[in-house]
Amino acid sequence: MKAYLDLMRHVLDNGTDKSDRTGTGTRSVFGYQMRFDLGKGFPLLTTKKLHLRSIIHELLWFLKGDTNIKYLKDNNVSIWDEWADENGDLGPVYGYQWRSWPAPDGRHIDQIANVVEQIKKNPDSRRLIVSAWNPALVDEMALPPCHALFQFYVADGKLSCQLYQRSADIFLGVPFNIASYALLTMMMAQVCGLEAGEFVHTFGDAHLYRNHFEQAALQLEREPRALPVMKINPEVKDLFAFKFEDFELEGYDPHPHIKAVVSV
């Protein structure tokens, strides 16, 4: 995961100090890209331990089209707690936009199902896109989508994915985002009869919060270790049929966890 450490170092050394919505303050750069070859291991950060359970359950929750944190709470995942209302609702966030984008004529568009179908029928299409950024509903969301749009690309029997992330919390959020979209790409590839290719991560405002500088410096002192391998149940051929038990991580040997406060 040298690419991730390079991003962190680049922002610390070359970023601009800015104010932000949370009042914490950031150091940020605008425009950056990382690439991960999914054939060379699963890109789960090794310079600090990550909670893979949260990453997998959040992705499954997105794919269900769910926007209430009950499923997450039932599975001991708390990453969305700060933004939910008293009933656990988040408004029309990722899952709703992915699976039930409202059209002007009253229809609801299942963007994920449509993309799976198009990858199978027309893999050379340049329209294999899912957007979570719906301007008409942004104000109703507890948190507007940070990872806003992603596109798939098929070449030489491999499926690749590029994510555009408008806002990226480098220390806390980005490691989760890398693993989540890498896993989604692998799942999509399997159900479409393809191999996983690359995950390309493109950023708009990539930032380190000021209260994460010490943690970032500590992480930069650590040597990356070999990437783990993600095993996915080969029997699952329906993207929406995956369960937590269908994933097994092998060979994950990270450095210890580093605590940091999330800015809400």
From Swiss-Prot:
Family assignment from sequence similarity: Belongs to the thymidylate synthase family. Bacterial-type ThyA subfamily.
Matching NCBIfam families: PRK01827.1-3, PRK01827.1-5, thym_sym
EC number annotated for this UniProt entry: 2.1.1.45
Protein name: Thymidylate synthase
Annotated organism of origin: Neisseria gonorrhoeae (strain ATCC 700825 / FA 1090)
Gene: thyA
Function: Catalyzes the reductive methylation of 2'-deoxyuridine-5'-monophosphate (dUMP) to 2'-deoxythymidine-5'-monophosphate (dTMP) while utilizing 5,10-methylenetetrahydrofolate (mTHF) as the methyl donor and reductant in the reaction, yielding dihydrofolate (DHF) as a by-product. This enzymatic reaction provides an intracellular de novo source of dTMP, an essential precursor for DNA biosynthesis.
List of catalytic residues: 146 (nucleophile)
Known partners and oligomeric status: Homodimer.
Reactions listed under catalytic activity: dUMP + (6R)-5,10-methylene-5,6,7,8-tetrahydrofolate = 7,8-dihydrofolate + dTMP
Binding positions for (6R)-5,10-methylene-5,6,7,8-tetrahydrofolate per the UniProt entry: 51, 169, 263
Pathway(s) per entry: Pyrimidine metabolism; dTTP biosynthesis
Pfam families xref list: Thymidylat_synt
GO molecular function, one term: thymidylate synthase activity
Cellular localization per UniProt: Cytoplasm
Recorded GO CC terms: cytosol
